[in-house]
């Protein structure tokens, strides 16, 4: 029936909207509640492990449902095969984490705390809209971040010798670079939240915050991860804008259009530069950043080993495999302090 709750629910399933926003906020609150319960029980000597375990298990199940629900969005709407694949892998991994945590793998509490921190960093930018309080209009938090990223991206584009027009995006932000092609066609490149690097910054911040280590080393790890991620993202965004705005990667158009279910030939350069090259490059970059961060904060190895266990069902010793120290390099006995 038109306008019925069932109709609304069917419209909200397998996309990103009000239902998915509500679900992910509930999941993050459950992760946070589990972390606080486990921490309080440990600090006070009270046996609250069962309550924390049940809460965290529920959160993991909800997290799995969120990723499962998002797969069609990433595949069909966002046209990102990498993100769709990650969501498809993430859903059963979350269900498996719920099972493992409930049956006794308590090291997963660290990853649970990390996810809570990630969510509280990322979700305000993703879900909070512009509001008016007492007659004063407050922009959506995402607007600040997107427009700052747009300005910095523009500096890089200008330094490369290009000068597209900066116009308003569909969201109402000054965050679109408008290119005029040689045949007179107008092509717009939109700067969105994903271009800011916020997602990756939230992931590393959550992981760093969740482990037990001295604050000084956590800050050093953040100082390694956050600037690198942001700088790489603005250069990536500038690269995509230049490539798409000048049709520099109009490669194998028929194959690319078929692969992404597109018909617009002007989209080929964007799809190649963003959905293929940049996303594959991002995977490599994140692996390299992870290696650098772990050298500053070896406690993260436990979390990474848990993630690998969820994906493979086997325990791994990353310290031995990657020849990484369990102590940070600068703090190892006898470490060189310079020539």
Say what each PLM segment does.
Residues 1-339:
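Hydrophobic N-terminal alpha-helices or hydrophobic patches in metabolic proteins across all domains
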């Amino acid at each position: 029936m038109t306008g019925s709750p069932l109709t609304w629910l069917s419209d909200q399933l397998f996309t990103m909207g009000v239902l998915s926003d509500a679900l992910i906020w509930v999941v993050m609150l459950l992760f946070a509640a589990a972390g606080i319960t486990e921490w309080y029980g440990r600090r006070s000597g009270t046996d609250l492990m069962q309550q924390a375990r049940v809460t965290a298990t529920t959160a993991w199940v909800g997290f799995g449902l969120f990723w499962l629900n998002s797969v069609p969005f990433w595949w069909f709407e966002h046209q990102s095969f990498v993100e769709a694949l990650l969501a498809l892998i993430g859903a059963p991994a979350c269900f498996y984490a719920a099972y493992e945590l409930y049956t006794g793998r308590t090291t997963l509490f660290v990853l649970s705390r990390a996810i809570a921190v990630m969510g509280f960093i990322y979700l305000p930018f993703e879900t909070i809209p512009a509001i008016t309080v007492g007659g004063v209009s407050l922009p959506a938090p995402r607007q600040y971040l997107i427009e700052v990223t747009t300005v910095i991206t523009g500096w890089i584009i200008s330094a490369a010798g290009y000068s597209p027009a900066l116009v308003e995006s569909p969201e109402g932000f000054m965050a679109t670079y408008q290119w005029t092609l040689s045949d007179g066609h107008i092509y717009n490149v939109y700067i969105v939240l994903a271009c800011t690097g916020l997602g990756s910054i939230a992931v590393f911040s959550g992981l760093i915050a969740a482990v037990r280590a001295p604050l000084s080393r956590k800050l050093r790890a953040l100082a390694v991860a956050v600037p690198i991620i942001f700088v790489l993202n603005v250069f990536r965004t500038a690269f995509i804008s230049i490539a798409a705005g000048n049709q520099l990667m109009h490669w194998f158009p028929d194959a690319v259009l078929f692969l992404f279910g597109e018909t617009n030939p002007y989209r080929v350069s964007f799809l190649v530069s963003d959905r293929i090259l940049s996303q594959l490059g991002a995977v490599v970059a994140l692996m390299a950043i992870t290696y650098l961060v772990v050298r500053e904060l070896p406690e993260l190895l436990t979390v990474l080993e848990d993630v690998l266990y969820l994906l493979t069902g086997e325990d791994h010793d990353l310290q031995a495999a990657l020849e990484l120290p369990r102590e940070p390099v600068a703090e190892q006995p006898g470490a060189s302090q310079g020539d």
